[in-house]
């Protein structure tokens, strides 16, 4: 199976990460909330806390070799 990275562990991201992992896939799950990372860590290959709104964070996560990257988060930018 392909290795996926799921960025954002809200309702959709968490469900996708756990479902794919239960099918035998390798999953890297990433969220800025340590609580969400802790909740999913037993179900996925790796769970990482990172703030994806910071520049260059994705490059430093070591996910450049995954087969699929899913971005499932919402950030409202107000000026």
Indicate residue ranges for each PLM-predicted region.
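Cytosolic regulatory regions of ion transport systems
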Residues: 1-79
């Amino acid at each position: 199976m392909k290795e996926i990275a799921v960025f954002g562990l809200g309702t959709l991201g968490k469900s996708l990460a756990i479902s794919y992992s239960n099918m035998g896939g390798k999953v890297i799950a990433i969220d800025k909330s340590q609580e969400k990372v802790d909740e999913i860590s037993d179900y996925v290959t790796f769970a990482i806390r990172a703030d994806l709104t910071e520049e260059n964070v994705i490059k430093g996560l070591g996910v450049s070799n995954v087969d699929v990257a899913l971005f499932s988060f919402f950030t409202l930018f107000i000026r």
